């Protein structure tokens, strides 16, 4: 009997010790999570999938930190355009931002691989490469430039709108003044197709379309809808010529100021928010097209027309493939070939 009591006492004491250790560990972890409010700014609308993803991220950070860590959302370029946001994040005066991959080409030319025309056939391919080893290596390299890459979110496949005519073939772009992202691939692609590319920040686009300073622009349908471009554009052509990913970027200064438990919260919240943002983006694409059909003339290109466009922009792809480098190009090509072989 005494032996049983002794064993029981030892077991109880051991359990108490374990619980005490866990409590101490939990207290230490809690102490490592400091109260802080961070800012997440971007150019798109709050009701766009990116905005909804940003809110999901903010909610997750608050939940996982017990309310200690907060993220304030600033949509619609209220703190500045993409270039200003990027500079602010690098400088540490802004904590988070997200923007098109093309805008990172000034930091690392290899990011241009994501902007090559007609590279991806569908979102499945785009997501696989965006989550793959090449993308991760490029994101990791941003730490040398004051940035932490937390993954690549989804903006979608770009389509063309304009106020003049439907775009069914390259010739239809002749002479059109088309707003483009201030990125080399976009500028050269539209030049090659006969348009006059006009680099412009996103916040300026609606006003330029309204005043007829430009004839058209290109964006995924979700952006076209949320930005209300249908109010100032008549034609939507579903060209799907470039897929645009949105790297989710964090200031390295903010990251370096964090404890390991805080970093863990950020990484977990970013991964969960990315999955949610992509889900919302995919769900909204078909709905957005249906909504835009009610207020715009929408045309879909034939497969033959798409192939002709692909052929027309091949010199652009070849040119920038050289700048991106054979290593990245070969790896991305291999990733896509492996994916397509599974179909």
Predicted regions and their residues:
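N-terminal secretory/targeting leader peptides
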Residues: 2, 13-16, 31-125, 133-134, ...
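N-terminal secretory signal peptides that target proteins for export/translocation
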Residues: 1-9
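Sec-dependent signal peptide hydrophobic core
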Residues: 11-19, 23
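Sec/Tat signal peptide C-region and signal peptidase I cleavage site
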Residues: 24-30
């Amino acid at each position: 009997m005494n032996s049983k009591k002794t064993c029981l006492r030892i077991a109880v004491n051991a359990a108490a010790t374990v619980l005490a250790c866990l409590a101490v560990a939990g207290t230490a972890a809690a102490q490592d999570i400091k109260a802080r409010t961070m800012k997440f700014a971007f150019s798109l609308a709050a009701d766009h999938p990116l905005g909804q993803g940003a809110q999901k991220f903010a909610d997750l950070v608050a939940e996982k930190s017990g309310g200690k860590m907060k993220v304030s959302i600033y949509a619609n370029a209220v703190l500045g355009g993409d270039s200003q946001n990027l500079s602010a994040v690098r400088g540490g005066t802004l904590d988070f931002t997200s923007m098109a991959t093309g805008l990172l080409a000034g930091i690392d030319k290899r990011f241009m691989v994501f902007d090559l025309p007609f590279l991806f056939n569908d979102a499945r391919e785009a997501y696989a490469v965006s989550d793959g080893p090449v993308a991760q290596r490029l994101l990791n390299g941003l730490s040398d430039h004051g940035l932490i890459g937390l993954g690549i979110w989804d903006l979608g496949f770009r389509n063309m709108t304009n106020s003049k005519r439907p775009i069914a073939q390259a010739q239809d772009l002749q002479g059109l003044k088309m707003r483009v992202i201030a990125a080399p691939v976009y500028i050269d692609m539209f030049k090659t197709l006969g348009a006059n590319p006009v680099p412009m920040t996103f916040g300026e686009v609606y006003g330029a379309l309204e005043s007829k300073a430009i004839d058209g622009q290109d964006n995924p349908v979700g952006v076209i809808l949320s930005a209300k471009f249908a109010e100032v554009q008549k034609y939507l052509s579903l060209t799907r010529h470039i897929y645009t990913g949105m790297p989710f970027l964090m200031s390295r200064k903010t990251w370096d100021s964090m404890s390991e438990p805080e970093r863990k919260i950020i990484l977990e919240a970013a991964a969960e928010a990315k999955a949610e943002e992509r889900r919302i983006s995919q769900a909204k694409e078909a709905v957005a097209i249906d909504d835009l059909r009610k207020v715009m003339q929408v045309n879909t290109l034939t497969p033959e027309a798409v192939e002709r466009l692909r052929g027309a922009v091949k010199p652009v792809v070849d040119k920038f493939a050289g700048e991106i480098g054979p290593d990245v190009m070969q790896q991305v090509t291999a990733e896509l070939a492996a994916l397509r072989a599974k179909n």
